[in-house]
Structures are given as structure tokens and as C-alpha cells.
Amino acid sequence: MSYERYEVERIAHAAFKSAMNRRSELCLVDKANVLEVSRFWRETVNKVAEEYPSVEYSQLYIDNAAMQIILNPSRFDVILTANLFGDILSDEASVISGSLGLLPSSSIGEKHCLFEPVHGSYPEGAGKDIANPVAMILSAAMMLEQFDMIKEAQDIYDAVDHCMEKSIMTEDLNPEVSYSCSQMGDIIESLILGEDIKLKSVKEGSASII
């Protein structure tokens, strides 16, 4: 696992800028007490942090961070870390949300960006209409934010939040009263468009009106 300085600087700047649009808190997660590459990350990020005095900057070792994200997830705003640790923490965070099917992701390059669900493809669910589409939909919202289409992105976030509040979910989150992938997509689309929706009963004895 090796990095060039410019690579760490680029992602560090992106993380600090993201923090400035949130709670202005950033935590660097590494293993600087053991790994040379983590010491390199910490040295580089410490210098970048000087350019963002308005952001509250902290550091945690990965083992402590893995514990804290379960015990007190709200303490974190933006986490900056290397790919190895990020893969671990993102899967761990899915336990808090209830499903990997809720987690979007983005890979931001200098010229190109990629937005996709954290879980990647789901070949086991092909043709079964059972996948949770929320992660993909939220990935689209992140893409809109990248294009500075903030209102459009917020409309998506609001629609998804509404579904979660009303327990309109796929089977991975609500096995007793669940909606299919296509139903979820249609509902979220209608909410974004501001349409009045009546949800048909998906299972006997269940019905919802938004």
C-alpha cells in the first residue's frame, strides 16, 4: 500500500472542502503508530489542515475508530482515510444504517467521477425485483451535488427520508411489510415530482397513504 504525496493532498483537500459544507469536522483515521504509510498520511494531512482553520481536525487510530463508529457514530462528520481502512469502516457503518443497500459512494478524480452503491453490483438479485435501489438513487444525488445541482439533490434526499420515516422499504430493511425494487423507485420518483401517491397493499393487511 503506497501513495504519492499529491494523491493524499488531493483527497485531503476534497475532504476538508466537504467538511466545510457540513459540520466543519474532519477526522483522519490511520495506524500511524504502526504503519509507515499512515505516518506519511498524517504528516501530509496535517499540513493540508493548516489551510482550513475553520474545520475542527482530529485523528484516530483505525482500531479506536472502528469501535467509536459503533458506540457513538454521531461524533463523526467527515472521515478521511486510506482505501484499506475506508473499506472496513464503510461496511461497518452499513450495520448502523441497517443495510448496505442504503449507502452511496463516489470516486472523485481530477477530470472524471464515478458514483455507485457501496455494495457494487448485485448479480444474485438479477430479474427478481428485490434489490434495494436507495443506494443507487442516493449515488445519483451525490452526482447532482458534484454538478452543483444542490436543490435537485436535496429533492432526492427528502424523498428518500420520507420513505424511511414512513417505513416504505425493501425486504432487507422491513421483511414483514416490504416493497419491491421497482415499487420503491416509482414511489421515490413520484415524491420528487411532487405527485400525490397512494400505495397499494403489498402484503395482505398492509396499506399506506402518503
Regions of interest found by a model, annotated:
Residues 1-12, 34-42, 73, 86, ...:
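Generic structural signal for well-ordered, non-membrane alpha-helical segments
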Residues 1-63:
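Glycine-rich phosphate/diphosphate-binding loop of Rossmann-like nucleotide-binding domains
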Residues 16-23, 30, 45-53, 73, ...:
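Structural signal for hydrophobic packing residues in well-ordered secondary-structure cores
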Residues 39, 67, 90:
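Active-site glycine- and acidic-residue-rich loops that bind
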Residues 57-76:
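A structured beta-alpha segment of the ubiquitous adenosine-cofactor-binding alpha/beta core
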Residues 70-168:
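Glycine-rich phosphate/nucleotide-binding loop
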